[in-house]
Amino acid sequence: MDDKDIDLFESQYVVPNGVSYNSYVIMDDKIAIMDTADARVTDKWFANLREALGDRKPDYLVVSHLEPDHASNIQKVAEAYPDMQIVGNAKTFNMMGQFFDIDLTDRKVVVAEGDKLSLGKHELTFVMAPMVHWPEVMMEYESTDKVLFSADGFGKFGALDTDEDWTCEARRYYFNIVGKYGAQVQAVLKKAAGLDIEKICPLHGPILTENLGFYIDKYNTWSSYQPEDEGILVACASIHGNTKKAAELLAEKLKATGVKVAFTDLCRDDMAEAVEDSFRYDRLVLCACTYDGGIFPPMEDFLHHLKAKAYQNRKIAFVENGSWAPTAARQMKAIVEGFKNIECVEPVVTIKSTLNKAVSYTHLTLPTKA
């Protein structure tokens, strides 16, 4: 269900088109509820659940992920249906007591990799997905309708009735929520390759039913930290606007060569989108001024985000500005040299206060390909 009133997802990511919290019900001889929803939509979720159940009662609640945006209503639904069993893995139940004050000892169904749960015509097979993006995460494959319940995998920002391309907000969601855990996503993709999947049901965003190879290929690219497109992100952090003017001029010159260029003002634009574009393209230009002998904080914050999300396999060039002792490039370079497989482009462009004819960007326009 949609939440269009939320301002920040995880209290940090802007979601102008809201977000959805997806919960599913499998109706069969036995009934399984697949996850709950955020506390923000509790009343609506229970109303939808009761409508789906009619005069029947659920047999199982399957807990794919304990994060509160999906699990906030576990205790309430368990109390509403006292005969319902709770399905999770060992890590699920180890963590559950940290969130809820309810004794589920006699109601637990503990599952592991490859275990099956028959509902009648439908059968769930459990696929462990640790650290995608919490340690207890698991997915479920339903073999009759060939559905993968993918937890946070293949999710995106945006309400379900938002008319927008899947890729952009799915990419922003992936790199900012799951991006650090590429190896773990790769492991799950290998498991999924052995399944006959016709539908993917994530916990956020639309159900995917067509051209599934497109979405899986995107996840394979993203989780292997390979560039999705050839292009350059010019990211700037400017105090009084002079560094930004230089960065904008550079972006214009790069575009004139036929290169795809994205631009972000780190002082004003969405940080999550800057992270997204950094991973999308194969090259990055960092433009920042020196501040109190260090890096201007918006740029330093950006580099912290890239480090946290395991940014790698890219080329990076540097533009620095300083009125008396420019050191930003040296310090930015010291940070990114700690990233995996990064090529630092030389020479550094140094600006003293304002741009003038002595500053050359020629070296940054070449090579036009990674």
Predicted regions span which residues?
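Metallo-beta-lactamase
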Residues: 88-210
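Active-site neighborhood of phospho(di)ester-bond hydrolases with catalytic His/Asp-centered motifs
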Residues: 34-36, 59-66, 87-89, 148-151, ...
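Zn-dependent metallo-beta-lactamase
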Residues: 1-30
